[in-house]
Amino acid sequence: MKNKNPIIIVEGIDRVGKTTLCNMLSEATGFPIYKYDESVVSYDKMDNDNETDKMRQLIKLHELTNAGGVIFDRFHMSDFVYGILNRKYCTLHARDNLLLIDSDLSAAEAIVILVDPVDIKYSSDMHGSDLSMHCLFFSYAFLKSKCCTLATDYNHLDACVNCVKELIE
């Protein structure tokens, strides 16, 4: 895979180093980071179909603009996991939408990185609630992906950056 216009997605539960990895990847590649602005997004009004539609539009926009790579700090897997566990999405419908977006991402040769917790109890304590189920749902989504996938944890972020650089250069 030598994609000069890659989509790189960093996923995982809260408090595992996703944003740190995104910043490291951006520094190493020069690609911008896209992250929802939480001061603008109202999570209680999020709907799985709307989120799916927005994500598919972002993928298409990236393809059309051919503006170089982009790094997403959370994307379709986060919507799937947090949507089911925190926003009452219908599980089967959310799974279908997850697979639909994953198919689009696979066609775009996206790289999906799952940042696993080094210590689930620590991540849960820092978050303020148990994230064990979230971790399991991320694992499910990650295993279902047809994209180029990498798994890492906070202790191996440098190695992950090197792997991504090898994939895109």
What feature does the model see in each segment?
Residues 80-98:
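A mobile, often basic/glycine-rich helix-loop segment
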Residues 68-80:
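Conserved P-loop NTPase "ATPase switch" module shared by AAA+ and STAND
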Residues 73-75, 93-123:
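Conserved phosphate-donor/acceptor-positioning beta-strand/loop module used by diverse small-molecule
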Residues 2, 126-169:
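NTP-dependent small-molecule kinase module
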Residues 13-16, 20-69:
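Conserved substrate/cofactor phosphate-moiety recognition/catalytic segment
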Residues 7:
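Walker A (P-loop) ATP-phosphate-binding motif of ABC ATPase nucleotide-binding domains
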Residues 14-16, 76-78, 117-120, 155-157:
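Short, solvent-exposed loop/turn segments at secondary-structure junctions
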